[in-house]
Protein backbone atom coordinates (compact mmCIF):
# COMPACT_ATOMS: atom_id res chain seq x y z
CA UNK A 1 0.00 0.00 0.00
CA UNK A 2 2.90 2.37 0.67
CA UNK A 3 3.48 4.88 3.44
CA UNK A 4 1.91 8.33 3.64
CA UNK A 5 5.19 9.75 2.40
CA UNK A 6 5.12 7.46 -0.63
CA UNK A 7 1.67 8.71 -1.58
CA UNK A 8 2.70 12.33 -1.08
CA UNK A 9 5.64 11.72 -3.42
CA UNK A 10 3.43 9.97 -6.00
CA UNK A 11 0.89 12.80 -5.93
CA UNK A 12 3.60 15.50 -5.72
CA UNK A 13 1.64 17.03 -2.88
CA UNK A 14 3.68 20.24 -2.90
CA UNK A 15 2.62 21.01 -6.46
CA UNK A 16 -0.98 20.15 -5.59
CA UNK A 17 -0.92 22.63 -2.71
CA UNK A 18 0.39 25.28 -5.11
CA UNK A 19 -2.61 24.59 -7.36
CA UNK A 20 -4.97 24.75 -4.36
CA UNK A 21 -3.58 28.14 -3.37
CA UNK A 22 -3.67 29.32 -6.99
CA UNK A 23 -7.47 29.04 -7.06
CA UNK A 24 -7.69 31.27 -4.00
CA UNK A 25 -5.26 33.72 -5.62
CA UNK A 26 -7.59 34.01 -8.61
CA UNK A 27 -10.57 34.67 -6.36
CA UNK A 28 -8.72 37.20 -4.20
CA UNK A 29 -7.36 39.10 -7.19
CA UNK A 30 -10.84 39.26 -8.71
CA UNK A 31 -12.66 40.32 -5.55
CA UNK A 32 -9.79 42.50 -4.28
CA UNK A 33 -10.72 40.96 -0.96
CA UNK A 34 -10.82 37.58 0.75
CA UNK A 35 -13.75 35.41 -0.40
CA UNK A 36 -16.57 34.95 2.10
CA UNK A 37 -19.93 33.19 2.24
CA UNK A 38 -20.92 31.37 -0.94
CA UNK A 39 -17.86 32.74 -2.74
CA UNK A 40 -15.67 31.08 -0.11
CA UNK A 41 -17.57 27.80 -0.45
CA UNK A 42 -17.22 27.84 -4.24
CA UNK A 43 -13.54 28.76 -4.08
CA UNK A 44 -12.79 26.02 -1.55
CA UNK A 45 -14.57 23.37 -3.64
CA UNK A 46 -12.77 24.48 -6.80
CA UNK A 47 -9.45 24.42 -4.94
CA UNK A 48 -10.22 20.85 -3.83
CA UNK A 49 -11.10 20.03 -7.44
CA UNK A 50 -7.71 21.33 -8.60
CA UNK A 51 -5.82 19.53 -5.82
CA UNK A 52 -7.37 16.15 -6.64
CA UNK A 53 -7.05 16.76 -10.39
CA UNK A 54 -3.34 17.54 -10.10
CA UNK A 55 -2.77 14.57 -7.79
CA UNK A 56 -4.37 12.28 -10.38
CA UNK A 57 -2.34 13.87 -13.19
CA UNK A 58 0.94 13.44 -11.33
CA UNK A 59 0.18 9.85 -10.35
CA UNK A 60 -0.88 9.02 -13.92
CA UNK A 61 2.40 10.45 -15.19
CA UNK A 62 4.33 8.05 -12.94
CA UNK A 63 2.01 5.19 -13.87
CA UNK A 64 2.69 5.67 -17.58
CA UNK A 65 6.42 6.17 -16.98
CA UNK A 66 6.67 2.94 -14.99
CA UNK A 67 9.08 1.15 -17.35
CA UNK A 68 11.26 4.23 -17.87
CA UNK A 69 11.39 4.95 -14.14
CA UNK A 70 12.48 1.36 -13.43
CA UNK A 71 15.74 2.39 -15.11
CA UNK A 72 16.00 6.13 -14.47
CA UNK A 73 14.13 6.53 -11.15
CA UNK A 74 13.94 3.10 -9.45
CA UNK A 75 13.49 4.85 -6.09
CA UNK A 76 10.06 6.24 -7.07
CA UNK A 77 7.05 4.71 -5.24
CA UNK A 78 5.76 2.71 -8.25
CA UNK A 79 8.93 1.19 -9.76
CA UNK A 80 10.25 0.41 -6.28
CA UNK A 81 7.09 -1.59 -5.59
CA UNK A 82 6.20 0.41 -2.48
CA UNK A 83 2.88 1.27 -4.14
CA UNK A 84 1.11 -1.32 -6.29
CA UNK A 85 0.17 -0.23 -9.83
CA UNK A 86 -3.41 -1.45 -9.46
CA UNK A 87 -3.85 0.49 -6.22
CA UNK A 88 -2.30 3.55 -7.86
CA UNK A 89 -4.78 3.39 -10.76
CA UNK A 90 -7.65 3.15 -8.27
CA UNK A 91 -6.32 6.29 -6.58
CA UNK A 92 -6.01 8.04 -9.96
CA UNK A 93 -9.64 7.29 -10.83
CA UNK A 94 -10.78 8.29 -7.33
CA UNK A 95 -8.97 11.62 -7.66
CA UNK A 96 -10.72 12.31 -10.97
CA UNK A 97 -14.10 11.54 -9.39
CA UNK A 98 -13.38 13.85 -6.44
CA UNK A 99 -12.30 16.60 -8.83
CA UNK A 100 -15.46 16.36 -10.92
CA UNK A 101 -17.65 15.98 -7.83
CA UNK A 102 -16.18 19.12 -6.26
CA UNK A 103 -16.75 21.02 -9.51
CA UNK A 104 -20.36 19.79 -9.59
CA UNK A 105 -21.03 20.89 -5.99
CA UNK A 106 -19.48 24.30 -6.66
CA UNK A 107 -21.76 24.61 -9.68
CA UNK A 108 -24.79 23.84 -7.53
CA UNK A 109 -23.89 26.70 -5.18
CA UNK A 110 -23.24 29.04 -8.11
CA UNK A 111 -26.59 28.11 -9.66
CA UNK A 112 -28.36 29.15 -6.45
CA UNK A 113 -26.54 32.51 -6.53
CA UNK A 114 -27.61 33.66 -9.99
CA UNK A 115 -30.51 33.59 -12.43
CA UNK A 116 -28.08 33.21 -15.32
CA UNK A 117 -25.95 30.10 -14.76
CA UNK A 118 -24.39 30.61 -18.19
CA UNK A 119 -22.12 33.17 -16.54
CA UNK A 120 -20.51 30.25 -14.68
CA UNK A 121 -19.94 28.13 -17.80
CA UNK A 122 -16.32 29.32 -18.22
CA UNK A 123 -15.48 27.47 -14.99
CA UNK A 124 -16.58 24.20 -16.57
CA UNK A 125 -14.79 25.05 -19.82
CA UNK A 126 -11.51 25.66 -17.96
CA UNK A 127 -11.83 22.31 -16.16
CA UNK A 128 -12.46 20.54 -19.48
CA UNK A 129 -9.55 22.39 -21.11
CA UNK A 130 -7.24 21.18 -18.33
CA UNK A 131 -8.51 17.64 -18.91
CA UNK A 132 -7.84 17.92 -22.66
CA UNK A 133 -4.32 19.19 -21.96
CA UNK A 134 -3.72 16.25 -19.60
CA UNK A 135 -4.91 13.67 -22.10
CA UNK A 136 -2.96 15.19 -24.99
CA UNK A 137 0.14 15.48 -22.82
CA UNK A 138 0.20 11.86 -21.73
CA UNK A 139 -1.33 9.90 -24.64
CA UNK A 140 0.83 9.44 -27.76
CA UNK A 141 -1.12 6.51 -29.21
CA UNK A 142 -4.31 8.32 -30.24
CA UNK A 143 -3.79 11.94 -29.15
CA UNK A 144 -0.92 14.42 -29.48
CA UNK A 145 1.49 12.97 -26.91
CA UNK A 146 2.84 16.43 -26.05
CA UNK A 147 5.06 14.99 -23.34
CA UNK A 148 7.49 13.78 -26.00
CA UNK A 149 7.24 16.78 -28.31
CA UNK A 150 9.59 19.13 -26.53
CA UNK A 151 8.51 22.75 -26.11
CA UNK A 152 4.78 22.13 -26.78
CA UNK A 153 4.77 19.74 -23.82
CA UNK A 154 6.44 22.33 -21.59
CA UNK A 155 3.87 24.88 -22.73
CA UNK A 156 0.95 22.52 -22.02
CA UNK A 157 2.17 21.99 -18.45
CA UNK A 158 2.73 25.71 -17.94
CA UNK A 159 -0.69 26.71 -19.26
CA UNK A 160 -2.36 24.10 -17.07
CA UNK A 161 -0.61 25.57 -14.02
CA UNK A 162 -1.62 29.11 -14.97
CA UNK A 163 -5.23 28.07 -15.57
CA UNK A 164 -5.85 27.51 -11.86
CA UNK A 165 -5.85 31.28 -11.35
CA UNK A 166 -8.49 31.78 -14.06
CA UNK A 167 -10.39 28.84 -12.56
CA UNK A 168 -10.61 30.72 -9.27
CA UNK A 169 -11.71 33.91 -11.02
CA UNK A 170 -14.29 32.07 -13.13
CA UNK A 171 -15.74 30.47 -10.01
CA UNK A 172 -16.89 33.90 -8.86
CA UNK A 173 -18.24 34.80 -12.30
CA UNK A 174 -15.31 36.89 -13.63
CA UNK A 175 -12.96 34.65 -15.67
CA UNK A 176 -11.46 37.53 -17.66
CA UNK A 177 -10.71 39.75 -14.69
CA UNK A 178 -7.67 41.83 -15.67
CA UNK A 179 -5.75 41.12 -12.48
CA UNK A 180 -6.36 37.37 -12.71
CA UNK A 181 -5.45 37.31 -16.41
CA UNK A 182 -2.23 39.17 -15.58
CA UNK A 183 -1.26 36.52 -13.04
CA UNK A 184 -2.22 33.77 -15.49
CA UNK A 185 0.21 35.15 -18.08
CA UNK A 186 2.96 35.76 -15.53
CA UNK A 187 2.55 32.34 -13.92
CA UNK A 188 2.53 30.58 -17.28
CA UNK A 189 5.76 32.29 -18.34
CA UNK A 190 7.49 31.59 -15.02
CA UNK A 191 6.52 27.92 -15.24
CA UNK A 192 7.57 27.64 -18.88
CA UNK A 193 11.03 28.97 -18.08
CA UNK A 194 11.34 26.60 -15.12
CA UNK A 195 10.10 23.58 -17.08
CA UNK A 196 12.85 24.12 -19.65
CA UNK A 197 15.53 24.41 -16.96
CA UNK A 198 14.19 21.26 -15.29
CA UNK A 199 14.53 19.45 -18.62
CA UNK A 200 18.18 20.52 -18.77
CA UNK A 201 18.63 19.34 -15.19
CA UNK A 202 17.14 15.94 -16.09
CA UNK A 203 18.99 15.36 -19.37
CA UNK A 204 21.03 12.42 -18.07
CA UNK A 205 17.89 10.56 -17.03
CA UNK A 206 15.87 11.61 -20.08
CA UNK A 207 17.82 9.61 -22.67
CA UNK A 208 15.28 8.33 -25.18
CA UNK A 209 12.84 11.18 -24.49
CA UNK A 210 12.32 14.00 -26.98
CA UNK A 211 12.50 16.94 -24.57
CA UNK A 212 13.33 20.45 -25.73
CA UNK A 213 16.72 20.31 -23.99
CA UNK A 214 17.55 16.99 -25.67
CA UNK A 215 16.61 18.48 -29.05
CA UNK A 216 18.58 21.73 -28.97
CA UNK A 217 21.20 21.05 -26.32
CA UNK A 218 21.70 22.37 -22.80
CA UNK A 219 23.15 25.78 -23.70
CA UNK A 220 20.39 26.75 -26.14
CA UNK A 221 17.74 25.51 -23.72
CA UNK A 222 19.22 27.64 -20.94
CA UNK A 223 19.24 30.67 -23.26
CA UNK A 224 15.60 30.06 -24.15
CA UNK A 225 14.72 29.85 -20.47
CA UNK A 226 16.44 33.18 -19.80
CA UNK A 227 14.71 34.90 -22.75
CA UNK A 228 11.35 33.71 -21.40
CA UNK A 229 12.27 35.15 -18.00
CA UNK A 230 12.96 38.51 -19.66
CA UNK A 231 9.52 38.33 -21.27
CA UNK A 232 8.16 37.51 -17.81
CA UNK A 233 9.79 40.70 -16.52
CA UNK A 234 7.91 42.72 -19.15
CA UNK A 235 4.68 40.87 -18.30
CA UNK A 236 5.21 41.74 -14.64
CA UNK A 237 5.61 45.45 -15.25
CA UNK A 238 2.85 45.79 -17.87
CA UNK A 239 -0.22 45.62 -15.57
CA UNK A 240 1.28 48.36 -13.40
CA UNK A 241 2.00 50.52 -16.46
CA UNK A 242 -1.58 49.94 -17.70
CA UNK A 243 -3.15 50.88 -14.36
CA UNK A 244 -4.50 47.39 -13.65
CA UNK A 245 -2.56 47.61 -10.39
CA UNK A 246 -1.67 50.89 -8.66
CA UNK A 247 1.73 52.06 -9.90
CA UNK A 248 2.95 52.76 -6.37
CA UNK A 249 2.17 49.16 -5.42
CA UNK A 250 4.98 47.98 -7.70
CA UNK A 251 7.09 48.00 -4.55
CA UNK A 252 5.29 44.80 -3.50
CA UNK A 253 6.68 42.84 -6.44
CA UNK A 254 10.22 44.24 -6.05
CA UNK A 255 11.48 41.13 -4.17
CA UNK A 256 10.17 38.93 -6.99
CA UNK A 257 11.80 41.16 -9.62
CA UNK A 258 15.18 41.12 -7.92
CA UNK A 259 15.02 37.35 -7.45
CA UNK A 260 14.06 36.90 -11.11
CA UNK A 261 17.09 38.92 -12.24
CA UNK A 262 19.38 36.89 -9.96
CA UNK A 263 18.54 33.75 -11.95
CA UNK A 264 20.79 34.93 -14.80
CA UNK A 265 23.94 34.14 -12.81
CA UNK A 266 22.88 30.54 -12.19
CA UNK A 267 21.88 30.02 -15.82
CA UNK A 268 25.21 31.46 -17.02
CA UNK A 269 27.14 29.17 -14.67
CA UNK A 270 25.02 26.15 -15.72
CA UNK A 271 23.77 25.75 -12.15
CA UNK A 272 20.47 24.29 -13.26
CA UNK A 273 19.19 23.11 -9.88
CA UNK A 274 19.88 26.51 -8.34
CA UNK A 275 18.28 28.28 -11.32
CA UNK A 276 15.13 26.15 -11.04
CA UNK A 277 14.92 26.83 -7.31
CA UNK A 278 15.37 30.59 -7.75
CA UNK A 279 12.70 30.75 -10.47
CA UNK A 280 10.27 29.04 -8.10
CA UNK A 281 11.16 31.49 -5.32
CA UNK A 282 10.76 34.44 -7.70
CA UNK A 283 7.36 33.15 -8.77
CA UNK A 284 6.21 32.74 -5.17
CA UNK A 285 7.41 36.23 -4.18
CA UNK A 286 5.71 37.69 -7.25
CA UNK A 287 2.39 36.02 -6.41
CA UNK A 288 2.54 37.31 -2.84
CA UNK A 289 3.38 40.78 -4.15
CA UNK A 290 0.46 40.82 -6.58
CA UNK A 291 -1.95 39.70 -3.85
CA UNK A 292 -0.75 42.54 -1.61
CA UNK A 293 -1.08 44.97 -4.52
CA UNK A 294 -4.68 43.83 -5.08
CA UNK A 295 -5.66 44.00 -1.41
CA UNK A 296 -4.14 47.39 -0.63
Please provide the spans of the model-predicted regions.
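Residues within membrane-spanning alpha-helices of integral membrane proteins
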Residues: 16, 47, 93-96, 124-127, ...
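Functional transmembrane core segments of multi-pass inner-membrane proteins
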Residues: 30-45, 155-203, 219-236
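Select subsegments of transmembrane alpha-helices in polytopic membrane proteins
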Residues: 9-20, 84-94, 152-159, 219-228, ...
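Structural signal for membrane-spanning alpha-helices in multi-pass inner-membrane proteins
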Residues: 23-30, 99-107, 134-141, 164-172, ...
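Membrane-embedded alpha-helical segments that form the functional core of polytopic membrane enzymes
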Residues: 17-64, 96-104, 120-133, 176-197
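Extended hydrophobic alpha-helices typical of membrane-associated regions
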Residues: 2-5, 16, 22, 142-145, ...
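Intramembrane alpha-helical segments
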Residues: 2-9, 78-176
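Solvent-exposed interhelical
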Residues: 49-100, 188-236, 266
Amino acid sequence: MGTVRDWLVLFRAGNCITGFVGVFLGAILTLEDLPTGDNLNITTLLALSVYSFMASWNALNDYLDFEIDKINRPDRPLPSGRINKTVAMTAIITGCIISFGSLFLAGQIANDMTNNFEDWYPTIVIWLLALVLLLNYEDDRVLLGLKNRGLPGNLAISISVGLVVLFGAAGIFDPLNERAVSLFVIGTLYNLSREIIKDVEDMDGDKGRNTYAMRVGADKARLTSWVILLITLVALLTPFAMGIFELLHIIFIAPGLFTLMSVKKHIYLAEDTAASRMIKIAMTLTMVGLILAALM
